[in-house]
């Protein structure tokens, strides 16, 4: 993704990512302001009102991937402009598992392009509000089916089916995953330390895919998907308990695996 010119923040972000051992070869610095989003959470932090979205440098960003990234096991297109997502997908035709996230701005303003991108990926990971908005249906299960069939996307089912799998994040309601072998429902990890839900979706998707990386044929492997959802749920529960990335950036393996074990007992998974 592109980074704006808020230099001190860039340096800090780069240090955090490098410390985590991530390959930053594809990160580009561009002149201009960094993408900014502002929102307001209310009540039990379940509903969010977007106050402003400033695309800034990402508006004209043309992603060009390093050659070493051309054949990834897992390709995750985070919630940037759908045209950028399509550009990345086109550069990785041999990716083994392709996944997409989005948010309301693109649903409202770039639905045709977003629909094209959703039809090209294996998995879409979005929240319940976004699923229902795309489908124009408040019944979640029905809305999910219409997205997978392609009926809810631009052009309808005649333009082709949607993603093979759809995962709906439901906040304290847990997660509902519609997959080729059926549907999985899992609860949220119970916590009273609700500080900042921002970024929970990103950490959910990232940890879900990190578990699946290197496991061929995962979309038909119910145990692999269930275990990936365990890790996704636990990771996002840590994100919820701090501001931004503060909590997951400082977590230790012992605390993480203790929570994974606790959650497994809650949901009855050995």
Where are these regions (language model features)?
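A glycine-rich helix N-cap at a beta->alpha junction
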Residues: 16-35
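Short beta->alpha connector loops
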Residues: 9, 79-84, 103-107
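Conserved phosphate-binding/catalytic loop of the ribokinase/pfkB sugar-kinase fold
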Residues: 40-86
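Redox-cofactor binding/interface segments in oxidoreductases and associated redox assembly factors
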Residues: 75-77, 100, 126
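Conserved post-catalytic alpha-helical subdomain immediately downstream of the catalytic base
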Residues: 189-262, 266-269
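A short acidic, amphipathic alpha-helical/loop segment
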Residues: 16, 84-91, 112-116
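Conserved phosphate/ATP/ADP-binding segment of small-molecule kinases
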Residues: 93-97, 104-187, 193, 222
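Short, small-residue-biased leader/transition segments that mark boundaries at the very start
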Residues: 2-7
């Amino acid at each position: 993704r592109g980074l704006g010119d808020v230099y001190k923040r860039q340096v800090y972000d780069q240090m955090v990512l490098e410390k985590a051992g991530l390959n930053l070869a594809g990160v580009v610095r561009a002149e201009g302001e960094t993408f900014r989003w502002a929102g307001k959470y209310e009540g039990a932090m379940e509903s969010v009102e977007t106050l402003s979205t400033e695309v800034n440098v990402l508006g004209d960003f043309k992603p060009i991937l390093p050659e070493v990234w051309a054949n990834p096991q897992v390709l995750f297109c985070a919630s940037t402009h759908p045209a950028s997502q399509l550009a990345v997908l086109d550069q990785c035709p041999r990716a083994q598992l392709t996944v997409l996230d989005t948010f309301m701005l693109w649903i409202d303003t770039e639905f045709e392009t977003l629909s094209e991108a959703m039809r090209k990926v294996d998995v879409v990971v979005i929240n319940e509000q976004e699923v229902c908005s795309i489908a124009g249906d408040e019944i979640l299960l029905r809305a999910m089916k219409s997205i997978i069939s392609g009926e809810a996307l631009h052009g309808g089912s005649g333009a082709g089916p949607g993603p093979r799998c759809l995962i709906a994040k439901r906040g304290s309601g847990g997660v509902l995953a519609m997959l080729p072998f059926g549907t999985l429902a899992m609860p949220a990890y119970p916590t009273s330390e609700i500080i900042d839900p921002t970024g929970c979706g990103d950490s959910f998707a990232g940890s879900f895919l990190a578990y699946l990386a290197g496991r061929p044929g995962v979309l038909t492997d119910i145990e692999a998907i269930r275990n990936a959802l365990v890790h996704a749920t636990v990771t996002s529960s840590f994100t919820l308990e701090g501001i931004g990335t503060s909590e997951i950036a400082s977590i230790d393996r012992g605390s993480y695996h203790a929570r994974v074990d606790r959650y497994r007992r809650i949901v009855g998974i050995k």
